[in-house]
């Protein structure tokens, strides 16, 4: 739909401007929905340099450098984003945006950004996520 395409383009530009990042470095915006009990296990958004995934996913756009995530709704219970090494739980609130650097400025992975999506225990959780890469195809 042309309206959805324009919305995606507008969001891409706004997020890029907010983070002071070139919009062309970003992957497509993705939406996620978590039903009660659904979760996403602990992970990093970067690809480990020694993994098979690194060659597959980083060869053409480089490593994931930044993550931007925005919560779209309140969750009655649960649904926090938990950063294990920071001992930080972030409760979903509509419009709350969080972002983090997946790499240090010298290029090494930032292990402190390991995070997980805890399951909503009452209600659903909706988020939008955008990842930024080291370089662009354009």
Task: Label each region the model flagged.
Residues 1-99, 103-138:
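Fe(II)/2-oxoglutarate oxygenase catalytic core
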């Amino acid at each position: 739909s042309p309206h959805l395409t324009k919305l995606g383009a507008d969001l891409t530009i706004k997020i890029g401007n907010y983070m002071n990042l070139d919009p062309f470095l970003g992957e497509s915006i993705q939406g996620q929905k978590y039903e009660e009990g659904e979760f996403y296990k602990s992970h990093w958004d970067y690809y480990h340099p020694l993994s098979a995934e690194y060659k597959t996913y980083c060869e053409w756009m480089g490593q994931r450098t930044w993550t931007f995530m925005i919560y779209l709704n309140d969750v009655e219970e649960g649904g926090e984003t938990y950063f294990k090494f920071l001992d930080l739980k972030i409760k979903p609130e509509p419009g709350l945006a969080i972002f983090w650097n997946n790499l240090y400025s010298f290029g090494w992975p930032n292990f402190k950004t390991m995070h997980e999506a805890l399951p909503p225990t009452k209600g659903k959780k909706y988020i939008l996520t955008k990842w930024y890469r080291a370089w662009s195809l354009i």
